[in-house]
């Protein structure tokens, strides 16, 4: 998995930072891409990446502020104009009202999409979706308007079948390998029984990525961020601006770092950077956060991060 | 007056052309700026110009296709965020539905503007607005959906008072200059009467700028473009693609040039260039049009054109 930031600014675009959007690339066998927020100009940013809009099959919206949603109608329309193979469906997850906004925008512009568009408007906190490879959880944050954070849990990869060890045990190769890999107990032709579980290597833990919308500090953040391999957290304000952050329903870099430290996050990526922070001041934001949580980075537009598999203690595997 | 193109592409943004927007800068004493269409990313383009959003007090929308309106909510919101002196009101002229689109976008995003926003939805063709300096006319074009073209007529500048000639006539300077300039007949202290009209130089003709939305060729184009000093015309297709242009409710470069020639246009600016036209092919578009109407240019994003005063025959002045 890889994260690519398409917009890392707050409120309005600036010359150096577009408004919010981040792509989560599910590499490996799935090759789909999920977008989190679609500020105005996200489709323009995508033109400068290797992301192909047809690969984006899910969009998660944190909240309805313009700098997080105004790029949605244009992105959806342009995705429709792309030729070639049949365009797959796309599902948008977001707060109540997101389907109205998109549908009205498409209707007034008389845009007929070439693909199926589905909406899931969030109501209850907890497990939002589950498929073969992922579970996605959504919990409410504390912002000026309804706002959600997302926790993407990759499922564990099952261990590999240890073929060499099976050969040593003189188990015949063939269809029984599939049953052994599934963990079954198999009776061989010579009467011996062997247990698949004894021939499967260690499972590889899946990764956890937490992507938050704009928020004050609130207990749900701990639920969302616990043990995350990567936490994407807003940092609209700097150290010493806690009061401002609270008044404007945002967070400081130090609050984000404190959360990361408290709940065992591996890497903290700070985004939603105010236009007031430029040049050296961005380094100061990062430095202040690093004092609390060393593995912190203030991201820029187009920054890309590979998400490594977590190292776990043996007894957990 | 000056035209600055902020987006010159068709349908979707490309790396080299953004979707539609053009700014008409009313220099001289007014110093206001009028925008024609606001495709997604127009506010981003403005960041790379000297245009200050607060100076934009009128927006004219040609039609409701997404590549002409999806930048409107973001532009309006960001204009609101700008600090400093009190922000003046802004009026949007456009087809029926434009106020719904904007109001719903602002409502769902809970955006409260810091300035007064007014709408004028077009119904009848003809004179749309008149002030001290300008008349703006709107006529319907022939596109897939309701679409309008705008003709901006600058009023003539009255001639200057010929102070030297007054001195020669030994007319005393002072408050009577104002009355003479207004064309009054004034009785001097020495009993002579002098006619202001004899001491006013030639009037300067105002300029005519015609900015069209997407369109097939249709008789209203002639009404809109007659004697225009500058005609901004779409050129989605090239020579020999007349049938395609007709089917998709667009024009070819040669159709635009033919119109310009027929109705006495001074300069033709071709925009709304398809992403199919890049590099040398753009030059070909321009060359084909120039064969019919030599003073033609295919515009690029950020191209800026000063609009010169027309030279008129003496008897017209």
From Swiss-Prot, chains A, B:
Catalytic activity line of the entry: Endonucleolytic cleavage of RNA, removing extra 3' nucleotides from tRNA precursor, generating 3' termini of tRNAs. A 3'-hydroxy group is left at the tRNA terminus and a 5'-phosphoryl group is left at the trailer molecule
Record-annotated active site: 67
Matching Pfam families: Lactamase_B
Binding site for Zn(2+) 1: 63, 65, 143, 214
Record key words, sorted: Endonuclease, Hydrolase, Metal-binding, Nuclease, tRNA processing, Zinc
Molecular function (Gene Ontology), one example: 3'-tRNA processing endoribonuclease activity
The keyword Nuclease is assigned to this record: yes
Enzyme class: hydrolase
Record: residues binding Zn(2+) 2: 67-68, 214, 272
Chain coiled-coil ranges: none
Cofactor requirements of the protein: Zn(2+)
InterPro entries, per database record: Metallo-B-lactamas, RibonucZ/Hydroxyglut_hydro, RNase_Z/BN
Transmembrane segments: none
CDD domains registered for this protein in UniProt: RNaseZ_ZiPD-like_MBL-fold
EC number: 3.1.26.11
Cofactor stoichiometry and binding remark: Binds 2 Zn(2+) ions.
HAMAP family with a match to the protein in the record: RNase_Z_BN
Family note: Belongs to the RNase Z family.
Purpose: Zinc phosphodiesterase, which displays some tRNA 3'-processing endonuclease activity. Probably involved in tRNA maturation, by removing a 3'-trailer from precursor tRNA.
Subunit structure as annotated in this protein's UniProt entry: Homodimer.
Protein name in UniProt: Ribonuclease Z
Gene: rnz
């Amino acid at each position: 998995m890889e994260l690519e930031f398409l917009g890392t600014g707050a409120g309005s675009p600036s010359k150096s930072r577009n408004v919010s959007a981040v792509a989560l690339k599910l590499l490996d066998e799935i090759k789909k891409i999920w977008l989190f927020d679609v500020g105005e100009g996200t489709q323009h940013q995508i033109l400068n990446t290797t992301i192909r809009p047809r690969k984006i099959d899910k969009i998660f919206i944190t909240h309805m502020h313009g700098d997080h949603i105004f790029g949605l109608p244009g992105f959806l329309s342009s995705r429709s104009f792309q030729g070639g193979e049949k365009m797959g469906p796309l599902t948008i997850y977001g707060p109540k009202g997101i389907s109205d906004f998109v549908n009205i925008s498409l209707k007034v512009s008389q845009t007929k999409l070439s693909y199926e568009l589905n909406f899931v408007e969030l109501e209850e906190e907890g497990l939002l979706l589950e498929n073969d490879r992922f579970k996605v959880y959504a919990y409410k944050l504390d912002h000026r308007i309804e706002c959600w954070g997302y926790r993407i849990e990759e499922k564990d990869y099952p261990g590999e079948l240890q073929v060499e060890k099976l050969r040593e045990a003189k188990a015949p190769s063939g269809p029984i390998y599939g049953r052994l890999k599934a963990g079954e107990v198999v009776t061989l032709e010579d009467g011996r029984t062997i247990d698949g579980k004894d021939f499967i290597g260690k499972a590889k833990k899946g990764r956890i990525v937490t992507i938050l919308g704009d928020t004050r500090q609130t207990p749900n953040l701990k639920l969302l961020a616990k043990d995350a391999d990567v936490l994407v957290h807003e940092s609209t304000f700097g150290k010493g601006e806690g009061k401002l952050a609270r008044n404007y329903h945002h967070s400081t870099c130090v609050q984000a770092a404190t959360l990361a430290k408290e709940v065992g996050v591996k890497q903290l990526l700070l985004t939603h950077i105010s236009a007031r922070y430029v040049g050296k001041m961005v380094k100061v934001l990062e430095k202040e956060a690093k004092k609390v949580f060393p593995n912190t980075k203030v991201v820029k537009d187009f920054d890309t991060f590979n998400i490594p598999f977590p190292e776990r203690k043996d007894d957990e595997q």
